[in-house]
Amino acid sequence: MADPAAESIDASSSRFGRVVCYNQTAMHGSNTISAAAPFFMTQLSVANLTYRILYYFLKPLCLPPFVAQILCGLLFSPTVLGNNEVVLKLIFPYKYTMLLETFANLALVYNVFLLGLGLDLRMIKIKDIKPVIIAIVGLLAALLAGAGLYYLPSNGEADKILAGCMYWSIAFGCTNFPDLARILADLKLLRTDMGHTAMCAAVVTDLCTWILFIFGMAIFSKSGVRNEMLPYSLASTIAFVLLCYFVIQPGVAWIFNNTVEGGQVGDTHVWYTLAGVIICSLITEVCGVHSITGAFLFGLSIPHDHIIRKMIEEKLHDFLSGMLMPLFYIICGLRADIGYMNRTVSVGMMAVVTSASVMVKILSTMFCSIFLRIPLRDGLAIGALMNTKGTMALVILNAGRDTKALDVIMYTHLTLAFLVMSMVVQPLLAIAYKPKKKLIFYKNRTIQKHKGESELCVLTCVHVLPNVSGITNLLQLSNPTKKSPLNVFAIHLVELTGRTTASLLIMNDEAKPKANFADRVRAESDQIAEMFTALEVNNDGVMVQTITAVSPYATMDEDICLLAEDKQACFILLPYHKNMTSDGRLNEGNAVHAEINQNVMSHAPCSVGILVDRGMTTVRFESFMFQGETTKKEIAMLFLGGRDDREALAYAWRMVGQEMVQLTVVRFVPSQEALVSAGEAADEYEKDKHVDEESIYEFNFKTMNDPSVTYVEKVVKNGQETITAILELEDNNSYDLYIVGRGYQVETPVTSGLTDWNSTPDLGIIGDTLISSNFTMQASVLVVQQYSSANRQTAENNNQEPVQGKAKTDHEATPFMEDEDDEVEHQYSMRR
C-alpha cells in the first residue's frame, strides 16, 4: 500500500477537494438557490412587490409614502415574517444579508444625493421671521422632549447613554420637507399662508437637523462613545463643507460651462457626477461622519440652473425610489423587533412616549402662534405638519443602531412612534384644519353682463404646445382694444409626478420656474410663454400673465376654478381633448383631459368655453396675428335659445367691429307644429323665449348699420331640419369658426330627436353635431356655457368666508409663494 504522505497533492485543488482555479460563480453554480446573486434578486423582487402593494392600498387612505415604507420593513421584522422558516431559508437568510445591506446603503447614499440635488433654497424665500421662530422653537422643544423621553422605555447601555440620547432626540425633531410638500399639495394648501409658513419652517428644520446630525456623528465614535479624535473630526468636516462651497461648487459649474456644447449633456458628465458622489461620501466617512453627508453636500454643490440636475434626476429617481430604496426599508424592518420590545416595555409606556412624540411639536407651535398673532387653528395645522417624518428619520435611527448607541428596544420604539406620527398628520390636518373657502364677490362672471368698455378677464388653459395657436388666434379675434382690453391668465397644465413639488410658478423675467421639471416639459413651458408673450407684444389691448400649474390630474380642475375665482375671471377658455390629425379628422384624444373639462364646466365660478381647433392654427389665421392680413374671417353664431346661447351671442358680438371679421347670426325658430309636438320642451322654450327675444332685439338694434353683421332666421320643425339647415349654411358659405351654446341637458323644439345622439356631453347637442364625421367642414367650433350659480355644487355654499375687494390683476405680478402676509386675518383656498 502506498504511503499517504508520499501521495502528490494537486495544486489546483483545495483541502476539501474543490477545484480552485475552476470554481464556478454564483450565477453558474450547480445549486443556484444557495448563491448570493439569485438570493439578492429574490430579495429585490420581494421588497419591491411588497412596497408597491402596501402603497397601492394605503394611497386611498391619504397616507404618505413613508407609512408604506415603514410597514414594508416591519412586515419582515422578526415579530411578523422575519422568523418564518420559509422566509429565513429562501428569502432573507442571515449569511446573505451583507450583500443586501451593501446595496441598500448604496441606494441610500444616492437617494440623499438626490435630496441635496433637489433642495433649491431659492425656491422658497423667507420674508419674515415667523417660520424661523416656529422651526427653532419646535426643534428645541423636540430635542428637549426627546432627551426626556429617551429614559422612559429603557435606560440603554450606561457608556452610550449620551450618544443614544443624541440620536433619539435628533430623529425625534427632524421633519421631512418632500412629504410635507406632498401633503400640502394633496390638500390644496400650497398657496395658503399656512402652507407657505409650514414649508419655510420645514426647510429651516431640515437644515438644522443636518447640522446637528453631522456634528453629532463627529462627537461620538463608531462604537457609540465619545470620539477621542473630536477636534480633528470637526476640523476636517468643516474643511470639507468649505471645500464644497468655495471649490467644488464653482469648479463643477466651470467644468460644465466649458465642456457642455450646445446645451447637450453627454452620459460621460453624468457618470463622472455619480462617481463624485461616491468620492465625497468616502471623504466624509474618513472624516468621521456618515457617508451620506458627503453625498448631500455634493448634491447641493451642483449648479441649480444647469441641465445636468434634470438629467441625473431622470436617470436616478425612478430607479432608486422604485427599485433599490425598498431594500433600505427592509433592512430597517429586519432591525426592529416588536415582540422583544413588548416583553420589556409596557403598552402604557409605549402609549405615553408615542402620544408625547405627536403632541410636543403641536403644542410648541401653538404656543408660538399666540405670540406671533397666528390663529390657533393655523398653529395646530403647522404643528401637525412638523411631525411629518421621512427617510432622514430612518437614516438617523440606523446610524444610532450601527454605533450600538440605540438598542433594539429604543430603535423599535421610535420606529413605531414615527409610524404613528406619519399616519395621523394628514387625517389630523384634514379634520382640524378646515379653512373657509375664499368667496370673492364680483358681478362680471359672464360675458353677457360684462360692459363693453371695460377689461375682460380671461383664464386660458393649455395642456400641450399645439393647444396654444388656436387659443391665441381666438383671443386675437375677440377684438381687444385699449378701451376694452383683454387680461389673459394663461395656464400651462402639468401633471404632478412623483419627483415634482406641486406649486403655481409665475413665469416672467424676474421669476423663472425653478421646479425640477423634465427638460421636455420645461422647454414646452418656455415656448408656451413665448407664444402668449408674442400675443401681448403685437396687441396693445392684451395683457398676459403665463402660469405653470403643477398638480395631480385628479384635482387639476379645482386649481383652475380656484385661480379663476382669485383672478375674478369672467371666462375660462379650455382646449378640446381631441386634436386634429393630418387628414383633417379628430384623434381619440385624452380621456383625462376630457374629464378635467367636464369638471371645470360643472364647478366653474364663471362662464366657460371649449375650443375645438380644426383650422385656427393654419396660415390664414396666423397671418392675422400681425394685422398685415385683411382676409375676411367668416364667423357663424348659431342661436337656438337658452342662457348658453345668449352667452355665445355675447361673445360673438364682442368680435364685431374689426375690419376683417364677418359675423353671421343664425337663429333657429320652431314652427307652430314643432311647439305643439314638443310637449315639455316647448314649455321650457317659452320660459326663455322672452329673454331670448330681448337679447336678439338688442343685438339687432345696435348692429343694424354694421355691414359686417348678418342676421338670419330659419324656421324648423325638429332637430333633423336644424341639422339640414346647418348643412345648407356650410354649402353656401365657408365659415372659419362656429360659436354655439352648450345647452347641456336642455331639449328645445328645434333640437328634438337629437338628444339621444349626443355622445360628447361637454360640447352639447349642436357642438357634438358640428364636429361629427357627418360634417365635411373643417371649421373650428367654440362651445360656450354661461355661468349659473344653480349649476354649481350646493356643497360650496358651506364653510365659505365672504371676501370683499378685488383680486390682484396686475401684469407685473409676484410669485404666489411671495403673496402679502395678512397678519390680521388669514384667508385660504382649499378644496373640500
Swiss-Prot record:
One of its GO terms (cellular component) is plasma membrane. The keyword Membrane applies. One of its GO terms (molecular function) is antiporter activity. Residues 792-802 have a biased composition (Polar residues). Disulfide bonds: none annotated. Gene3D superfamilies: 1.20.1530.20, 3.40.50.12370. Belongs to the monovalent cation:proton antiporter 2 (CPA2) transporter (TC 2.A.37) family. CHX (TC 2.A.37.4) subfamily. This is Cation/H(+) antiporter 21. It comes from Arabidopsis thaliana.
